[in-house]
Design a protein with these regions (language model features):
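Regulatory nucleotide-sensing modules
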Residues: 1-13
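Short, acidic, Ser/Thr-enriched surface-loop or helix-capping motifs
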Residues: 11, 22, 148
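Phosphate-/nucleic-acid-contacting segments
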Residues: 108-172
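Short beta-strand segments in beta-sandwich/barrel cores
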Residues: 14-20, 38
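Surface loops and adjacent helix of pleckstrin homology
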Residues: 21-23, 44, 62-64, 158, ...
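Polybasic "coupling" helices that flank or enter modular domains
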Residues: 71-132
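Cyclic-nucleotide recognition modules
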Residues: 29-83
Length: 172
């Protein structure tokens, strides 16, 4: 589903991705947003910008104050810069691992031992991960399996994944 254009929404539950397209029609992820975040396409200079629901979401229309708008724009810039930086990593293996780390930092539970998060709860399929970081679905699937074999990614429950800090430090 897509949220209506030009409005600002506060996310209470669920996850949203903002995207645009290049001249060839390839999707470009501008940001991923979750509970507590504001999201809008009203301040973008790009056309089109689509606000896509990754999961079922609970949102409310919000009229942000000037301070909230500034905070939102700064967060949007940070989010886009971080995704851009990840996408500039040449190695597909390292790029996907850094994307998973970013997801863990941004939306997961962070501890001194590592990052715990759920791709399933965010509805980030292998295809969706591939779109975010400019890889193929097959490459994402192969790398996820490889990370699990190497211990860089651990399945800690049916839906939760864990990236241990020490394994990540070795991979970086």
């Amino acid at each position: 589903d897509v949220l209506p254009e030009g409005l600002t929404w506060r996310i209470h539950d669920g996850y949203i991705r903002t995207t645009t397209w290049d001249a060839e029609g390839e999707s470009i992820t501008l940001g991923i947003w979750g509970p507590g975040d504001l999201v809008t396409n009203a301040h973008s200079g790009l056309d089109p910008v689509e606000v896509q629901c990754l999961t079922t979401v609970v949102v409310e229309q919000h009229n942000p104050s000037d301070a909230e708008t500034l905070a939102f724009l700064l967060q949007q810039i940070r989010n886009t810069e971080e995704i851009f930086e990840i996408n500039r990593i040449r190695s597909a293996e390292r790029r996907l691992l850094m994307l998973l780390r970013w997801i863990g930092l941004r939306f997961g539970q962070v501890s001194s031992r590592g990052y715990r998060f759920s791709l399933k709860d965010m509805n980030l399929t292998h295809r969706a991960l591939a779109e975010v970081c400019g890889l193929t679905r097959v490459t994402v699937t192969k790398n996820l399996n490889r990370y699990k074999t190497l211990g860089l990614l651990q399945q800690v429950s049916e839906v939760d994944l864990f990236i241990p800090s020490e394994g990540l430090a070795l991979a970086i």
